[in-house]
Amino acid sequence: MNNKLTQHPDNAMLVEFSAGTLPTAASICVSAHLHFCQKCRAELLRLDQVGSQLMTEAEPADVDDSLFDSVMAKIEKAEAAPPENIDQKSDNGFPFSVNRLLNNPAHRPIWKRMSGSVDVARFKTGQTDYEVALHRICAGGKTPKHDHQGTEYTLSLIHI
């Protein structure tokens, strides 16, 4: 797999990723990028440390007593649920976040032909403003004519 990176997430995006507030679709792209980029992993670690320090120094907030019971109920419910059986040991060279999409038995990708050289699989994120779509493009293939409305993040994973 070719891992020459030409673009990187900006610091604002890495801060949101670190805080867990980045939308799912963008998080998948950032996670996949981090798989290949030592520079961005180092910056994320630094941001995580800053966030940790801020949390340590923050004044404790008053919380309703029922919140603890609610959190514990969610934890117990999650423990009772069977673990997802996702093949994490795939040796295809793809990042974990991409393998998680490709190998989830509950949501196997449905590939649809876009053109003679492009197939696409779309995934629901639960967010109406974002979409995750994986494209398989044959060597030498060209993407169909399309527009770029809104914000788009593209991560190209190239097998050579």
PLM regions and their residue ranges:
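Iron-sulfur (Fe-S) cluster-binding segments and ferredoxin-like electron-carrier domains
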Residues: 44-52
